[in-house]
């Protein structure tokens, strides 16, 4: 009987820890009856679980009689030890640039001691869809894409890394001397960034959108299938060899947003949000990324 009680209390502690991670110090907590109902447990067992969290130093509660109970102190790291996080899976772009490799390597290094895995997939739309469906725990996208997704419910912007952490710079690529004669622009419909930036750049212009794969973009311009694409320029010499030229994208803040990496979680996944806050040192992550980009360090992810 005692063993069964301990097992049940452990389940209740996990549920309470997940709830408390979504609260802030100073908040009035739900009543013990409400918590017992959410934990699908008895009031006595819920009280015992709450006392266990208090005695462990994870939280401190101030009880004010009829005015309720208030959370006055909380230790996120201590609470996280009571949450059942066996591993973390992050949806990430395909690592075809040193910047992506550095980001993947740097983020993984922050989760030292926690099993951390990547699911590499092309297209922010599919990464976010898998996140919302509970397939993965977090997703890396650009701030530009994130802003479009955050208009729908269910997502939380959990980590922001600043400009030029996702890509260096997007530019308009076309054949030399033909930037003023763009009639057909290539567009990979799986790329939220490219769709938004193409709409921003061309606005109401009478330009035909031609569906293509992002990684075929340059060759399709060379062949004459399209006149231009908005593309992340990694190697300028490659453009020169192909007879292409690049025009910087300016005059709209959304072009800069497309260069910033952010991490999304589900809005109700408080443990994952707190885990990111607890373990990620942004400066160390970005320094790691830059060492990979410069070749000082080999990526590991």
From Swiss-Prot:
InterPro entries, alphabetized: HTH_41, YhfZ_C
Pfam families linked to this entry: HTH_41, YhfZ_C
Disulfide bond sites: none
Name recorded for this polypeptide: Uncharacterized protein YhfZ
Organism: Escherichia coli (strain K12)
Gene label: yhfZ
């Amino acid at each position: 009987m005692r063993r069964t009680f301990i097992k049940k209390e452990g389940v209740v502690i996990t549920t309470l820890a997940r709830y408390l991670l979504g609260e802030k110090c100073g908040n009035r907590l739900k009543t013990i009856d409400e918590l017992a109902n959410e934990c699908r447990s008895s009031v006595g067992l819920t009280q015992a679980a709450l006392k266990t969290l208090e005695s462990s130093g994870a939280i401190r509660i101030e009880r004010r009689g009829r005015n309720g109970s208030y959370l006055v102190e909380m230790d996120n790291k201590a609470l996280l030890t009571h949450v059942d996080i066996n591993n973390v899976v992050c949806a990430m772009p395909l690592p075809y640039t040193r910047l992506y490799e550095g980001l993947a390597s740097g983020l993984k290094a922050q989760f030292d001691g926690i099993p951390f895995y990547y699911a590499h997939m092309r297209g922010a739309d599919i990464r976010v869809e898998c996140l919302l469906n509970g397939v993965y725990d977090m997703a890396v996208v650009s701030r530009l894409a994130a802003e479009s997704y955050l208009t729908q419910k269910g997502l939380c912007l959990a980590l922001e890394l600043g400009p030029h952490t996702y890509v260096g710079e997007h530019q308009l690529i076309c054949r030399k001397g033909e930037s003023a004669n763009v009639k057909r622009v290539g567009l990979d419909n799986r790329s939220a960034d490219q769709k938004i930036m193409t709409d921003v750049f061309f606005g109401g212009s009478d330009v035909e959108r031609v569906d293509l794969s992002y990684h075929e973009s340059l060759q399709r311009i060379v062949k004459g299938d399209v006149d231009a694409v908005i593309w992340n320029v990694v190697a300028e010499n490659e453009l020169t060899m192909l007879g292409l030229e690049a025009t910087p994208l300016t005059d709209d803040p959304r072009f800069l947003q497309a260069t910033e990496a952010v991490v999304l979680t589900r809005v109700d996944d408080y443990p994952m949000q707190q885990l990111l806050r607890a373990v990620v040192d942004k400066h160390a992550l970005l320094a790691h990324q830059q060492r990979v980009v410069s070749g000082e360090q080999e990526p590991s992810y």
